[in-house]
Amino acid sequence: MINQKRSFIFPLILSCFLFPHHLFAEYESSFDAKRLNKIDFMLDEAIQNKEIPGAVGLIMQHGHIIYHKSFGFADVNSKLPMTNDAIFRIASMTKAVTSVGVMMLYEEGKLLLSDPVSKFIPEFKGSRVIKTFDNQGIITETRAAKREIQIMDLLTHTSGIGYPFIPSKLSKTYAEAKIIDGLTADSIVLEDLIVNLADQPLLFDPGSSYAYGLNSDVLGYVIERLSGMSLDVFFQKMIFQPLGMHDTYFYLPQNKQERLVTLYADKDGNGIEVSDGTESDIYLDDPNYPINGSKMMYSGGAGLSSTAYDYSRFLMMLLNEGQVRQKSLLSRKSIELMRTARFDTDKDGELDFGLGFDVINHLKQSTELASVGAYAWGGAFYTTFWVDPEEKLIGVFMSQVRPVHSDAAKKFKNLVYQSLN
């Protein structure tokens, strides 16, 4: 077997301090241990087939760690084993953290979700929408937006703002304006990115459709403007420290840099190789952006790196309706609002976007095991999470591959659910 198994007793003890026993009903595991072992064999096979270099999987139920194992390698060439405390680029799993930050400011009365973004970032006043463009992708005419972008539009990706790496009518415009996806080792700061973005047209009128885009990056700048702190300091002071998250950063301190997992690419499904940042739709000027370069960009949409265990602490706060250490990071009603489905993202109503993640509305056409009301999201470099309020369950899967041709993350989730008694 390739898997590197690590003890999870110490994290379990910590979880008891973070989420006191009285916050959960008396606990009796709902899992079949023999069925859980199927995960080990599946991940070993994915590694042997060179689909992924390695992975860390974590399952927590009722605040107790059920499963926390590492497999394969953090760096294949040096045969550096994957460990439970390996640090991964979590990319869009950053978005849920940013959404929590916005909701914290909402609860402080510093903003309304119906507020126009221009109230905090004046450059967004008078946004325009694409009207026509030519066959070369050049926009030839725009019109005034029917209304301004609101905070809620950013939270639900219904603002009309796109992503450079997702093909759209804005692709050429974003390229010419040098709009980035938020990940860089260059000397670019969040303010410059957002002010530049505000000058670009929208794909559609705010609130009228859905397009995944740089919305959480804009929200990150709103947090900076309202809190008077950089997004980095706000996250550390207001979220990570209260949750005891000691391994989650935009840029890793020197004593933790060696734990960053190497990024791989599987261009054509024939096996992984070390990524140079140019193989996928997301261009990286440096795949090692969490440790190299200027370290000036704080992307609220994609910038964080973390461990499976650290991120599980954040997810447990969501599952426990904002409660942590007998205090409320957020109120129960705010968490309820965040996990309320708002905009259909898969055309059949099964998945709707909440405030930072997809929410499962029904299972009528589902091909995966899940629960109605569960919510989930993932990152571009093959990390994913889900929270299941019905089963009092969270799952985290982390690897580092893009492009990826593996089904390991989906299989991990299905194998977790098939292990429930």
Residue ranges and their predicted role:
Residues T384-W386, K392-V401:
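Short, well-ordered beta-strand elements
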Residues I2-F10:
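Bacterial N-terminal signal peptides that target proteins for export
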Residues Y27-I90, K110-L112, G126-D134, S406, ...:
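Short, conserved catalytic-motif segment at the N-terminal edge
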Residues P11-H21:
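Bacterial N-terminal signal peptides
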Residues K125-V372:
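Short, surface-exposed loop or secondary-structure junction motifs
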Residues V372-P389:
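Low-complexity, glycine/alanine/valine/leucine- and proline-rich hydrophobic stretches
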Residues N37, L43, G63, R89-F120, ...:
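Active-site SXXK
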Residues L23-A25:
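Boundary at the C-terminal end of the N-terminal hydrophobic targeting segment
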